[in-house]
Amino acid sequence: MKQTVYTASPESQQIHVWRLNTEGSLTLVQVVDVPGQVQPMVVSPDKRFLYVGVRPEFRVLAYRISPDDGALTFAAEAPLPGSPTHISTDRQGRFIFSGSYNAGSVSVTRLEDGIPVETVDIVEGLEGCHSANISPDNRTLWVPALKQDRICLFTLSDDGHLQAQNPAEVTTVEGAGPRHMVFHPNQQYAYVVNELNSSVDVWELHNPNGQIECIQTLDIMPADFADTRWAADIHITPDGRHLYACDRTSSLITVFSISEDGSVLAIEGFQPTETQPRGFNIDNSGKFLIAAGQKSHHIALYEIKGVQGLLEEKGRYAVGQGPMWVVVNAH
């Protein structure tokens, strides 16, 4: 399995393309100059395209991915109705979802053979919208509205329209600020990182009454932390054994172990990392984690070690200015 790491640096308007070597190092393959401040990125389900959100002219760019070395070639672009804070796709590669924090909206862009074509739906009134996350069954879009302490739930239709479900939302505690989320591989649980109180919520997707329920909340910060809380990102290993969340004020990555059924988290440790880690990701083998320091202008590569899933630094690499996003593609 070949793996490629992509890092987005909006201040220098660049994407750095890296080969992830099996022994735990990165080799630079390409530096792409992007026509705009590049922020969120996602790889298409079929691994053929990298989709990139840019501003100040709000667009999604599509780059073809070389199956040989992961290098990028520009393919197409389409306008977006708001500044893209987060982008993702449905699991069939038919639609792109773009969450916009500033616009308080989520939009749906139709794809034709991997190429973004047109906006087919937009939902507004989602204050502080920070991500859009399709459920494992590809039916429900989870959209955290950070400023409203709620996660809105929409049914995705075959033509890409979003219909509010009943109930239409789940709510966090006041002041939590739900931001990003991941699903457990068993499709029974979701984990949400809350920006404003630096916590992680465990959501049971189908409790005995058929409802969505928050069953655990954990503080991701050390007990003696007394500064402003500013959590950012969350990711899970492919085997569902370990979860990681980061906080930007402390520049820490918190390491969690996950119970066998996915219902319980336990903190295993705290990993100091690059300054102001806004984004990170885990490779497809579950062996490595790559974190981006928005203020250090570097990425750090870690090996995930042992039963606890603790992190061992393998190297750090200069990228562009203000790196914010990391994605990994297996090809």
Curated annotation (Swiss-Prot):
An annotated GO cellular component: cytosol
GO molecular function, one term: 6-phosphogluconolactonase activity
Reaction equation(s) it catalyzes: 6-phospho-D-glucono-1,5-lactone + H2O = 6-phospho-D-gluconate + H(+)
A single GO BP: glucose metabolic process
A Pfam family per the record: Lactonase
Family annotation (InterPro entries): 6-phosphogluconolactonase_YbhE (IPR022528), Cycloisomerase_2 (IPR050282), Lactonase_7-beta_prop (IPR019405), N2O_reductase_N (IPR011045), WD40/YVTN_repeat-like_dom_sf (IPR015943)
Enzyme class name: hydrolase
Keywords from the named record: Carbohydrate metabolism, Glucose metabolism, Hydrolase
Pathway: Carbohydrate degradation; pentose phosphate pathway; D-ribulose 5-phosphate from D-glucose 6-phosphate (oxidative stage): step 2/3
Enzyme Commission no: 3.1.1.31
Keyword Hydrolase appears in the UniProt entry: yes
Functional summary from the UniProt entry: Catalyzes the hydrolysis of 6-phosphogluconolactone to 6-phosphogluconate.
PANTHER family: 6-PHOSPHOGLUCONOLACTONASE, 6-PHOSPHOGLUCONOLACTONASE-RELATED
Similarity comment text for this entry: Belongs to the cycloisomerase 2 family.
Protein name as annotated: 6-phosphogluconolactonase
Annotated source species: Enterobacter sp. (strain 638)
Highest classification ranks of the organism: Bacteria, Pseudomonadati, Pseudomonadota, Gammaproteobacteria, Enterobacterales
Gene: pgl
